[in-house]
């Protein structure tokens, strides 16, 4: 239904709500640098023309022009990862043509954080330049210390990254990142929120007793975690609808075959809300290990702070946590970890 805003800011609001802003398509990253830059510039110029045609107040257009810069070039930083992906390249190093343009548009100015578009844009710009295939936290901290002098921008990126990493994967190996957070983030609300999630993960450190579960196998039998003591337990929290979960299944099968007869229980814990979907998948007969249905409303998932799947958990023979966020079956270091444990 067509509608119009009224009142003192009607012109601005109608412009923001109704304007068909230009955006750059993901596939544009397949273009070579010179053409990608031209396409990005064209999007920005089209949005500027749209703004100028709207007869907006002068005090608004100055800010809007800056907002449109970040909105129009939103995909520009991701070119470094999207381009080699779309072109199926083993490696890609951007030329000075691209990097100079990135420096031109990626303004480091904390005052720009008033625009939602800037926060996402500058974070992606920093991530794409910082991450080089090693330890991401170390790479990011080193890059920001060398290149980001604006305290507001540094705090914004540090908070967003550190909170996401700790809330999703815990405290293991995060001491340096946590210290970096407290050095660069001073907003009491952000610090309190971060400290709370750190405290939640304290109970999931290595050596802590694992939260328990009782789940149902395909025959309706109840199986508890305590019944699995005596062997290491490698748990896969998954669901039939989860693409990344399904992607790990072939690797899990290989692991189970490689360590058959060893002191490791391989446990699949389904969090499917639709139990029949899980039953149909298990009845295919190609999934090994101990397959159980846990469901969505589980204390186990809440206590392990699981907010995304798949999630892998590794426990020792006494039911104590080794890793609350263990490597996936597809990661090479999982076999090294198993081998080290089995030598003990």
Name each model feature, range by range.
Residues 229-231, 261, 287, 306:
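Active-site acidic short loop of glycosyltransferases
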Residues 232-233, 310:
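Alpha/beta-hydrolase fold active-site loops
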Residues 235, 267-269, 313:
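Conserved hydrophobic packing residues within short motifs/helices of P-loop NTPase cores
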Residues 285-287, 294-340:
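Thiol/disulfide oxidoreductase modules built on the thioredoxin-like
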Residues 65, 275, 279, 331, ...:
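Extracytoplasmic/secreted envelope proteins and their assembly/folding machinery
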Residues 1-219, 223:
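Oxidative protein folding and maturation machinery
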């Amino acid at each position: 239904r067509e509608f119009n805003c009224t009142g003192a800011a009607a012109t601005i609001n109608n412009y923001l709500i109704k304007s068909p802003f230009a955006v750059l398509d993901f596939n544009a990253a397949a273009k070579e640098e010179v053409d990608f830059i031209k396409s990005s510039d064209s999007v920005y110029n089209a949005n500027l023309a749209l703004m100028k045609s709207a007869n907006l107040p002068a005090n608004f257009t100055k800010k809007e022009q800056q907002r449109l810069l970040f909105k129009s070039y939103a995909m520009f930083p991701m070119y470094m990862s999207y381009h080699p992906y779309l072109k199926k390249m083993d490696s890609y190093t951007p030329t000075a043509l691209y990097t100079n343009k990135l420096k031109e548009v990626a303004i480091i100015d904390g005052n720009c954080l008033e625009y939602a578009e800037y926060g996402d844009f500058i974070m992606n710009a920093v991530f794409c330049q910082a991450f080089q295939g090693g330890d991401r936290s170390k790479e990011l901290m080193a890059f920001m210390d060398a290149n980001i002098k604006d305290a507001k921008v540094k705090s914004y990126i540090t908070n967003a990254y550190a909170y996401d990493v700790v809330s999703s994967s815990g405290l293991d190996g995060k001491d340096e990142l946590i210290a970096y957070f407290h050095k660069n983030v001073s907003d009491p609300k952000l610090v309190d929120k971060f400290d709370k999630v750190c405290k939640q993960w304290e109970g999931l450190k290595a050596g802590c007793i694992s939260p328990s579960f009782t789940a149902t196998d395909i025959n309706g039998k109840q199986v508890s975690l305590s019944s699995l003591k005596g062997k290491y337990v490698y748990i896969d929290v998954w669901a039939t609808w989860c693409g990344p979960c399904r992607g790990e299944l072939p690797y899990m099968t290989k692991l189970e075959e490689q360590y058959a007869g060893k002191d490791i229980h391989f446990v699949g814990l389904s969090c499917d809300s639709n139990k029949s979907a899980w039953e149909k998948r298990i009845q295919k007969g190609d999934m090994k290990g101990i397959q159980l249905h846990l469901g969505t409303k589980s204390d186990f998932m809440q206590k392990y702070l699981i907010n995304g799947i798949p999630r892998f958990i590794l426990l020792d023979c006494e039911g104590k946590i080794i890793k609350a966020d263990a490597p996936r079956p597809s990661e090479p270091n999982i076999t090294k970890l198993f081998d080290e444990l089995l030598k003990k």
